Amino acid sequence: GIYASMQTRIYSSKGLIRYYDRENLMPDILNLASGQYHVFVIAGDSVPAAFDTPYYTGSADFAVQSGETTSAEVKCTIANTLATVAFSPELANVVTDYKVKIFTTTGELSFTESTVDSVGYYMLNGKDRSLAWSFEGKKTDGKNYTQSGVVENVVKATKYAFTFSYNADNAATGGTFIDVKVNESTVDSTHNVVITQRPQIVGDKFDITQPLYYETNSGKEAAIWVNAATKLKNVKLSCE
Protein backbone atom coordinates (compact mmCIF):
# COMPACT_ATOMS: atom_id res chain seq x y z
CA GLY A 1 0.00 0.00 0.00
CA ILE A 2 0.88 3.67 0.10
CA TYR A 3 2.47 3.37 3.55
CA ALA A 4 5.01 0.84 2.29
CA SER A 5 6.52 3.53 0.06
CA MET A 6 6.56 6.24 2.73
CA GLN A 7 9.81 8.10 3.38
CA THR A 8 10.22 10.34 6.41
CA ARG A 9 13.02 12.84 6.94
CA ILE A 10 13.52 14.79 10.16
CA TYR A 11 15.75 17.85 10.18
CA SER A 12 17.26 19.93 12.97
CA SER A 13 19.30 23.12 12.66
CA LYS A 14 22.26 20.87 11.83
CA GLY A 15 20.52 19.26 8.85
CA LEU A 16 19.08 15.79 8.31
CA ILE A 17 19.15 13.76 11.54
CA ARG A 18 16.69 10.92 10.89
CA TYR A 19 15.58 9.04 7.78
CA TYR A 20 13.00 6.25 7.68
CA ASP A 21 11.63 4.13 4.84
CA ARG A 22 10.40 0.57 4.23
CA GLU A 23 13.88 -0.81 5.00
CA ASN A 24 14.39 1.38 8.06
CA LEU A 25 10.96 1.65 9.65
CA MET A 26 10.10 4.63 11.81
CA PRO A 27 9.43 3.52 15.41
CA ASP A 28 6.19 4.42 17.14
CA ILE A 29 8.11 6.65 19.54
CA LEU A 30 11.20 8.77 18.91
CA ASN A 31 13.72 10.01 21.44
CA LEU A 32 14.74 13.53 20.41
CA ALA A 33 16.72 16.18 22.23
CA SER A 34 15.02 19.47 22.99
CA GLY A 35 15.01 21.87 20.06
CA GLN A 36 13.29 22.87 16.82
CA TYR A 37 12.63 20.28 14.11
CA HIS A 38 11.20 20.04 10.61
CA VAL A 39 9.72 16.82 9.23
CA PHE A 40 9.16 16.09 5.54
CA VAL A 41 7.19 13.06 4.35
CA ILE A 42 6.64 11.62 0.88
CA ALA A 43 4.68 8.53 -0.15
CA GLY A 44 3.99 6.90 -3.49
CA ASP A 45 5.84 7.11 -6.80
CA SER A 46 6.80 10.47 -8.29
CA VAL A 47 6.63 9.67 -12.00
CA PRO A 48 5.74 12.05 -14.88
CA ALA A 49 2.56 10.13 -15.77
CA ALA A 50 1.05 6.81 -14.71
CA PHE A 51 -2.30 5.19 -14.13
CA ASP A 52 -3.52 4.84 -10.54
CA THR A 53 -0.20 5.94 -9.04
CA PRO A 54 -0.74 8.73 -6.48
CA TYR A 55 2.09 10.67 -4.88
CA TYR A 56 1.74 12.43 -1.52
CA THR A 57 3.89 15.04 0.20
CA GLY A 58 3.66 16.84 3.53
CA SER A 59 5.76 18.71 6.06
CA ALA A 60 5.51 20.28 9.50
CA ASP A 61 7.59 22.14 12.07
CA PHE A 62 7.56 21.10 15.70
CA ALA A 63 9.44 21.81 18.92
CA VAL A 64 10.61 19.41 21.60
CA GLN A 65 10.86 20.78 25.14
CA SER A 66 13.00 19.20 27.82
CA GLY A 67 10.91 17.10 30.21
CA GLU A 68 7.80 17.28 28.03
CA THR A 69 6.11 14.91 25.62
CA THR A 70 5.62 16.12 22.05
CA SER A 71 3.42 14.80 19.27
CA ALA A 72 3.73 16.10 15.69
CA GLU A 73 1.20 15.36 12.96
CA VAL A 74 2.03 15.68 9.27
CA LYS A 75 -0.83 15.95 6.80
CA CYS A 76 0.23 14.53 3.44
CA THR A 77 -1.79 15.78 0.50
CA ILE A 78 -1.80 14.51 -3.05
CA ALA A 79 0.78 16.23 -5.25
CA ASN A 80 -0.53 15.01 -8.62
CA THR A 81 -2.83 16.47 -11.21
CA LEU A 82 -5.44 13.84 -12.12
CA ALA A 83 -7.23 13.11 -15.39
CA THR A 84 -10.04 10.75 -16.38
CA VAL A 85 -11.65 10.11 -19.76
CA ALA A 86 -15.19 9.04 -20.64
CA PHE A 87 -16.66 8.30 -24.08
CA SER A 88 -20.33 8.74 -24.97
CA PRO A 89 -21.98 5.60 -26.45
CA GLU A 90 -22.90 7.26 -29.78
CA LEU A 91 -19.24 7.75 -30.67
CA ALA A 92 -19.04 4.11 -31.71
CA ASN A 93 -21.53 4.85 -34.52
CA VAL A 94 -19.27 7.37 -36.27
CA VAL A 95 -15.70 6.48 -35.33
CA THR A 96 -13.83 3.28 -34.46
CA ASP A 97 -10.51 2.37 -32.89
CA TYR A 98 -10.51 5.67 -31.04
CA LYS A 99 -8.23 6.68 -28.22
CA VAL A 100 -7.29 9.82 -26.36
CA LYS A 101 -3.82 10.88 -25.33
CA ILE A 102 -3.50 13.27 -22.41
CA PHE A 103 -0.01 14.57 -21.91
CA THR A 104 2.30 17.14 -20.39
CA THR A 105 5.79 18.11 -21.50
CA THR A 106 7.22 15.17 -19.56
CA GLY A 107 4.58 12.41 -19.53
CA GLU A 108 1.82 10.90 -21.64
CA LEU A 109 -1.03 8.42 -21.10
CA SER A 110 -3.37 6.82 -23.65
CA PHE A 111 -7.03 6.30 -22.74
CA THR A 112 -9.23 3.79 -24.56
CA GLU A 113 -12.50 2.01 -23.82
CA SER A 114 -10.51 -0.50 -21.77
CA THR A 115 -9.07 2.20 -19.50
CA VAL A 116 -12.15 4.34 -18.87
CA ASP A 117 -12.18 3.30 -15.21
CA SER A 118 -8.54 4.28 -14.70
CA VAL A 119 -7.25 7.56 -13.33
CA GLY A 120 -4.19 9.21 -14.81
CA TYR A 121 -1.77 10.81 -12.35
CA TYR A 122 0.55 13.53 -13.67
CA MET A 123 3.43 15.32 -11.96
CA LEU A 124 3.77 18.89 -13.20
CA ASN A 125 7.17 20.54 -13.19
CA GLY A 126 7.73 24.14 -12.20
CA LYS A 127 6.86 25.60 -15.62
CA ASP A 128 4.32 23.05 -16.85
CA ARG A 129 0.78 24.25 -16.17
CA SER A 130 -1.25 22.62 -18.94
CA LEU A 131 -2.78 19.29 -19.94
CA ALA A 132 -2.79 18.74 -23.69
CA TRP A 133 -5.06 16.16 -25.32
CA SER A 134 -5.46 14.55 -28.73
CA PHE A 135 -8.29 12.37 -30.04
CA GLU A 136 -7.49 9.81 -32.73
CA GLY A 137 -9.83 7.43 -34.51
CA LYS A 138 -11.04 6.12 -37.84
CA LYS A 139 -14.25 7.38 -39.44
CA THR A 140 -16.80 5.06 -41.04
CA ASP A 141 -15.42 5.97 -44.48
CA GLY A 142 -12.02 4.61 -43.43
CA LYS A 143 -10.31 7.98 -43.12
CA ASN A 144 -8.36 8.93 -40.02
CA TYR A 145 -9.79 11.59 -37.75
CA THR A 146 -7.83 13.68 -35.25
CA GLN A 147 -8.71 16.53 -32.94
CA SER A 148 -6.64 18.18 -30.22
CA GLY A 149 -6.72 20.85 -27.55
CA VAL A 150 -5.15 22.14 -24.35
CA VAL A 151 -6.45 22.77 -20.84
CA GLU A 152 -4.51 25.70 -19.42
CA ASN A 153 -3.65 26.64 -15.84
CA VAL A 154 -4.11 23.20 -14.35
CA VAL A 155 -3.12 22.70 -10.71
CA LYS A 156 -2.20 19.83 -8.44
CA ALA A 157 -4.69 18.06 -6.16
CA THR A 158 -7.29 18.60 -8.88
CA LYS A 159 -9.04 16.12 -11.18
CA TYR A 160 -9.89 17.00 -14.77
CA ALA A 161 -12.64 14.74 -16.09
CA PHE A 162 -12.72 14.72 -19.91
CA THR A 163 -15.91 13.61 -21.69
CA PHE A 164 -15.83 13.01 -25.46
CA SER A 165 -19.16 12.91 -27.29
CA TYR A 166 -20.54 13.15 -30.84
CA ASN A 167 -21.79 16.53 -32.12
CA ALA A 168 -24.19 15.84 -35.00
CA ASP A 169 -24.72 19.54 -35.82
CA ASN A 170 -21.02 20.18 -36.37
CA ALA A 171 -20.69 16.98 -38.38
CA ALA A 172 -23.50 18.11 -40.71
CA THR A 173 -21.65 21.34 -41.52
CA GLY A 174 -18.30 19.65 -42.02
CA GLY A 175 -16.78 20.83 -38.75
CA THR A 176 -15.19 18.90 -35.90
CA PHE A 177 -17.76 16.39 -34.77
CA ILE A 178 -16.29 15.62 -31.33
CA ASP A 179 -17.46 17.65 -28.36
CA VAL A 180 -15.06 17.78 -25.42
CA LYS A 181 -16.17 18.81 -21.96
CA VAL A 182 -13.81 19.07 -18.99
CA ASN A 183 -15.13 19.03 -15.44
CA GLU A 184 -12.72 20.28 -12.78
CA SER A 185 -12.93 19.12 -9.15
CA THR A 186 -10.68 19.32 -6.11
CA VAL A 187 -9.20 16.06 -4.84
CA ASP A 188 -9.45 15.87 -1.06
CA SER A 189 -7.15 12.94 -0.39
CA THR A 190 -4.82 13.03 2.62
CA HIS A 191 -2.78 10.70 4.82
CA ASN A 192 -1.82 11.64 8.36
CA VAL A 193 1.53 10.67 9.86
CA VAL A 194 1.98 11.04 13.63
CA ILE A 195 5.45 11.43 15.09
CA THR A 196 5.62 10.97 18.84
CA GLN A 197 8.35 11.59 21.36
CA ARG A 198 9.17 8.84 23.88
CA PRO A 199 6.85 8.92 26.97
CA GLN A 200 8.13 10.81 29.98
CA ILE A 201 8.41 8.61 33.10
CA VAL A 202 9.23 10.31 36.41
CA GLY A 203 8.99 9.51 40.09
CA ASP A 204 6.72 11.48 42.41
CA LYS A 205 9.05 13.17 44.93
CA PHE A 206 11.93 10.80 44.17
CA ASP A 207 14.55 10.26 41.48
CA ILE A 208 13.40 7.31 39.39
CA THR A 209 16.94 6.76 38.14
CA GLN A 210 18.08 5.91 41.67
CA PRO A 211 17.17 2.80 43.74
CA LEU A 212 14.58 2.98 46.51
CA TYR A 213 15.56 1.20 49.75
CA TYR A 214 13.05 0.01 52.35
CA GLU A 215 13.37 -2.11 55.44
CA THR A 216 11.70 -5.50 55.26
CA ASN A 217 7.96 -5.30 55.99
CA SER A 218 8.08 -1.52 56.36
CA GLY A 219 7.66 -0.27 52.80
CA LYS A 220 5.55 2.71 51.74
CA GLU A 221 3.71 3.80 48.63
CA ALA A 222 5.63 5.31 45.72
CA ALA A 223 3.94 7.02 42.78
CA ILE A 224 5.27 7.04 39.24
CA TRP A 225 4.00 9.42 36.58
CA VAL A 226 3.86 8.33 32.94
CA ASN A 227 3.22 11.18 30.51
CA ALA A 228 2.57 10.11 26.90
CA ALA A 229 1.47 12.00 23.80
CA THR A 230 -0.77 9.14 22.69
CA LYS A 231 -2.83 6.50 24.44
CA LEU A 232 -0.72 3.67 25.86
CA LYS A 233 -1.94 0.10 25.53
CA ASN A 234 -0.18 -1.02 28.71
CA VAL A 235 2.45 -0.04 31.26
CA LYS A 236 4.58 -2.64 33.02
CA LEU A 237 6.42 -1.99 36.28
CA SER A 238 8.93 -4.34 37.84
CA CYS A 239 11.19 -4.27 40.90
CA GLU A 240 14.03 -6.36 42.22
Residue map of PLM features:
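Extracytoplasmic cysteine-anchoring/structural motifs
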Residues: G1-M6, Y11-S13, N24, N31-Y55, ...
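Short hydrophobic alpha-helix segments
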Residues: Y20-D21
